[in-house]
Amino acid sequence: MIGGQARVGKTTLAKWISEYAYNNKYTPVIVPFAAALKEEAAKKGYTKDTNQEEYREFCQTLGSTMREQDPDYWVKEFRNKIKKLYEEEQTALKADPSIWHEKVIIVDDCRYTNEIAAARDIRALTVFVSAGERELPEEFAEWRTHESEALAIAIETGNKQYEDMFHYTLKNEETEAAFKTKCQAKFDEWFHLLAESMLDALCNCELCLSSREDRLPDGDAVFKEIMELIIDKEDNDKPTKT
C-alpha cells in the first residue's frame, strides 16, 4: 500500500510495481481505497474526464460525509472489493485451474491512519512516497487543506510517529528517472518479503514480535491468508450478543 500527498507519485509507483509483478509471473491488480468512492462519483456523472475541480470536490465531500457516519466505511468497502476478487478468482479456477497466477494487490491511495491499520491487518507492505525538497503541483491549492491530505502533510513536516506506521519511505524529489531507479532497487526485496510473509520482521512492536512465530511458510497461500485475515477482522468487529 502506497501513501503520500496528492500528485507525489503514488500512482506512478503503483504502475511500476505492476510492471515488475507482471514480468515476474504475478497478476497485478490495483485496488484503491477510493475505488468504491469513484464508482459512486461516476454514477453521478463525475469522472477525471469531466471537470477536474468538480470531480475532486465531489469525491472529497462524499468521502468525508461517509467517514463522519462511519470512520471505517471506505475500509469496509475496500475489504468487500478484495473479497469479491477472491471469490471471482475461485470461480475462474474451478473452471480452468491452469489460469492460476499469484495475485499482487496494489493500493495507491493510503491516506488515513485507519487505512494503514487495515493494511497491517492483512500484512501488507506499506510505502510512503515523500516529496522531500520538491515543490508539488498546486502546492498551495485550497484542496490540499482537505483532511485526506493531513496524514501525508504531517509526515512531510516531521511527524515521525506517523511516518513509522509505514514500512518504507522513499523520496521523490529529483527526476522521474531517478525516482524509478530508486524504486526498482527495492522491488526484489519487497516481493521477497511478501512471498515469505516476513513483513513483521520490519517492526519491533509488541504485536509484530509476538506474531513472528506465525509466518506463512508458503508464499502461494498469501492471497488466501489475506482473505482469512479479512474475515477474522470482520468477525472481531461484530458486536457480541448479550
What would you call each of these model-derived segments?
Residues I2:
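Hydrophobic anchor at the beta1->P-loop junction of P-loop NTPases
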Residues Q5:
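P-loop (Walker A) phosphate-binding loop of NTP-binding proteins
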Residues K10:
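Conserved lysine of the Walker
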Residues L13:
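Hydrophobic positions on the alpha1 helix immediately C-terminal to the Walker A/P-loop
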Residues Y26-V104:
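ATP-dependent small-molecule kinase phosphotransfer cores
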Residues K81-E87, A92-K94, S98-E139:
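ATP-dependent NMP and nucleoside kinases share a basic, alpha-helical "lid"
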Residues T113-I116, R120-I122, F128-M198:
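Small-molecule kinase domains that catalyze NTP-dependent phosphoryl transfer to phosphate-bearing small molecules
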Residues L194-E213, D218, N236:
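Amphipathic alpha-helical oligomerization segments
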